[in-house]
Amino acid sequence: MAFVLCPDLQREQCIPKMRRLLFAYLVLAAACTFGGHYAESQQSTDIRRVLDGRMLPGEEVATFERSETLYPSDVVRRGSVIRALPVADKRIESVLFQIGDKRYDLFDYLALNRVAGLLVLKDGKVALEDYELGAGPRTRWASFSMAKSVTSTLIGAALQDGLIDSLDDPVTRYVPALRGGVYDSVSIRNVLEMASGVRWDETYTDPNSDCRKLTDAQMSHQGGASLAYMKDLPRAAPPGSVWNYNSGETNVAGAVVEGATHLSLAAFLSQTLWSPLGMERDATWWTESPGGMGMGGAGVGATLRDYGRFGLFVLSDGVIADRHTVPEGWFQEAGRPHRIGGKSVDYGYLWWPMPPRDPIHAGAFEARGIFGQHLYINPSQKLVIVVLSARPKPTGSTVLDDTAFFAAVARALR
């Protein structure tokens, strides 16, 4: 007897569905064999202390190296083939840059910004690779909000695969748990632009902020707690009229990915990018509960080189094996400033456009995370820079300007 998985679909529609079902089965089998998530008992440092910036330097580094212990975490499986990163003919030994009336060099940047890992890829080749603070090539380092840009990319992949029809679809089409609440009139595009109009306070260090209340909900490790909190928030403005940075919004974006693909964020990332891109190590991604919904706003843990490989994928406009994994031009759209409520905002689809004050950054954009995490993409210079750091506070630490350093690197390699 033959099993017919999708008798109501044409063959070209059926094959992708069969592949997704097969992949989901393989992921489940791997989870049963190897452990698809990290147990709650493995958690150590309280995430609230992390957000408060109340950690000694050594404890902070140890925590960022084992970010999967902060929450239950799914494993993002790599494939069997590793993509080599060749060494560039032109290497960076040092670089000079100026901020105000003071001059700095590479060594100042590494030391003063508490950099654990720095990778520079020019034309797909390694121009600089450095590890500090005890980190090394196999160290998986916390992405924090750089994961938002990964989630954005997965939405692009789901759109390309026809699993999402349009960015103008309401998020509730893919996330039924949000129906009947403040997100009823919010589109996927609104969420990607952080322009839902939902009231939100992002203050990391304030226990009464929405950011911290969402953290408390996630710390309960109860499935559905995050979406329940988001659903009941009040409205501050009409959708699409005001920009407001909102990490909770990206958990909604992650839920859209999971609802559209019927896979976890980790499984869809593995299927779409991590395996075919030739990553050298499994990654991890936070979930709100063991085996539960992935956190679209934070929580990827990956090696320096694998973040770099992801950056090269972005630089290629999302092409893998001559196929667009995301819609053509997706990253140009995702990485440029958008107009919200008639005003230009320096934010794209969960990516940060670089400030235009230095022409070397023209068309460049980055993924950015608290404590000094950066994935800088400069298409015109064919340049990717990854910075993994352990700054003392989530934001506001006195450090050297990253954009000035990136500009100096770009000029040194022209």
Predicted feature locations:
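N-terminal leader/targeting segments and the immediately adjacent pre-domain N-terminus
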Residues: Q10-I15, C32-G136, I164, E193, ...
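Active-site-proximal alpha-helical segments within enzyme catalytic domains
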Residues: E249-V256, G296-V319, Q373-A390
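Active-site Gly/Thr loop motif
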Residues: M279-T284, F331-V384
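Short, charged, amphipathic alpha-helices and their helix-cap/turn boundaries
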Residues: K125-D130, D169-R173, P207-P238, L263-D282
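Active-site helix/loop module of the DD-peptidase/beta-lactamase fold
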Residues: A142, D161-R199, T203, D232, ...
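Bacterial N-terminal signal peptides
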Residues: A24-A31
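A short acidic/small-residue loop/turn micro-motif
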Residues: E132-G136, R140, R391-K393
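Active-site SXXK
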Residues: G124, W141-L167, V191, A253-V257, ...
